[in-house]
Amino acid sequence: MESFAYVLILTFAIATLFFAIAFRDPPKIGK
């Protein structure tokens, strides 16, 4: 259970950073 919570928080942190960069600069990946 502890490892699952850790992975969930880590994924949320990475997603937050990804969206922050994606919305700050024009998308360079994809279309």
UniProtKB/Swiss-Prot annotation:
Membrane-spanning segments: 3-23
Any coiled-coil regions, as ranges: none
SUPFAM superfamilies, per the entry: Photosystem II reaction center protein T, PsbT
Keyword entries, A-Z: Membrane, Photosynthesis, Photosystem II, Thylakoid, Transmembrane, Transmembrane helix
Function text: Found at the monomer-monomer interface of the photosystem II (PS II) dimer, plays a role in assembly and dimerization of PSII. PSII is a light-driven water plastoquinone oxidoreductase, using light energy to abstract electrons from H(2)O, generating a proton gradient subsequently used for ATP formation.
Family: Belongs to the PsbT family.
Quaternary data: PSII is composed of 1 copy each of membrane proteins PsbA, PsbB, PsbC, PsbD, PsbE, PsbF, PsbH, PsbI, PsbJ, PsbK, PsbL, PsbM, PsbT, PsbX, PsbY, PsbZ, Psb30/Ycf12, peripheral proteins PsbO, CyanoQ (PsbQ), PsbU, PsbV and a large number of cofactors. It forms dimeric complexes.
Protein name according to UniProt: Photosystem II reaction center protein T
Species per Swiss-Prot/TrEMBL record: Synechococcus sp. (strain CC9902)
Organism lineage: Bacteria, Bacillati, Cyanobacteriota, Cyanophyceae, Synechococcales
Gene: psbT
